[in-house]
Amino acid sequence: ATTFLVLESGQPVEERLSRTYIEGNSALHNVRIQYDGNSGLMAGADFTRYHSPGFQTFVDQSHETTVTDMQNNSKQDISQGALFINHSHTFETGWALNYGVHGGFTSSKTYIDYLYNKGNGYEPALDELENNRQKEYSGNAFLEVSKDFGSHFSATASLKVEYFKSDYTSNGMKSTLWNDWTLFPNATLSYTVNPMHIIQLDISSDKTYPSYWDVTPQESPINSYSVILGNPSLKPYRSYSGQLIYILKQKYTILAFCDYVPDYFAQLPYQNTSELKNVFRYENMDYQLQFGVGVIVPFRVGEFWNSQVTLSGQRMQEKLDHFHDLSFHNEKYTGQFKMDNTFTLSKSRPNLKLDLNGYFVTGAVQGIYDLGHLYDVSSALKWQFADDRATLILKCNNIFRSNMPHTMEINQSGQYSRLWKLDDQRCVTVSFVWKFGGYKKKQHEAVDASRFGKSM
């Protein structure tokens, strides 16, 4: 529940109370068939099914009067299939060749209705009903070559070409969201001066697509003066990254990096020009640019303490010239400290280890937002017994409930707001693992569900 007091010159105080109740669940099923041949041939098929129903109740009151009493039902059904074939071959000259093709199809169905109680029970608002379907067709082919030139220099280069088309049907109206070709160059160069000094250059490119829910023209109220909207005009963004890495004594790492992301998108707020309401919506920016340096230092203290420290500093820049009658070009220098520790409390009978990890970030920018600092401390106590076949793990994440920005502030073109979020993501878990004989867990490619479900 949230309470707001709106003060206007010459007018009495108005108190608004809003209550939101949200429930939902999701189910994901995946089937993958893959053939790995001795000649370097790999072929297979993959199918994923996702289902997620949801329900929301929103009540907004002013004194004793109900302004809005709304119920919202939603449902998302996604079917995704893919076929792929890859082949790798190593020649006697030392050259290695890897190539393949991949084709995919996705169908995402989204249903949303809104029911309002105006004194005679909940009645559907037929003009707000959303019954949408998004169909995606994708195909790509890639070629990768690599070679070791003696004992000092090695190189890997690849190029992928992708075709992607997305058709959208909203309440019977058809449109095309995206229809384009994209090239993805990647390269890795490594030079070993000697085993104590190694230099590596990595260049990569990628593409990120918005979730199916975020391009749906839906509306989800947060409170009396805030709402989340979908953005059917949202575009995918490309990312280009470069890293120069120096490894000293096969132990210490120093790196410099740069990331350029045109059309980068993030959820940003803006003020509605027709009513007193803050609108949160995913928006494409002109670009995001980050560059900086970092260092990774591992160390040990006897057999008791094994640790790794990571320090990095970077400059962040995000720009958008046309943002709902505003524009922004925000820059910020930020730093990060991260430390991972493993303490061996006892090596045998009992075999006890304590993991204690933490990080601190000085702040960041996200579009029009200026984000405050955040930090996180998590730990895990592991007890191995029964000849190390059994493991009991007690884990606590986000111990101090601090892994969200301390403040989210906007001070732009006469618009000022400050948002505090309640961090309630602390989690304590207990798990038990038993290893049967010489069983080794097989490695499986994780299902990419990054575009499934709702993002709040």
Show the residue positions of the predicted features.
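Transmembrane beta-barrel architecture of outer membranes
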Residues: 26-30, 82, 138-140, 180-188, ...
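Face-selective signature of the C-terminal outer-membrane beta-barrel domain
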Residues: 1, 21-170, 192-198, 252-256, ...
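Conserved C-terminal beta-signal and adjacent last beta-strands/turns
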Residues: 330-456
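Transmembrane beta-strands of outer-membrane beta-barrel pores
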Residues: 47-53, 103-109, 161-167, 203-209, ...
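Outer membrane beta-barrel strand-and-loop segments of large Gram-negative receptors
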Residues: 80-82, 128-130, 235, 241, ...
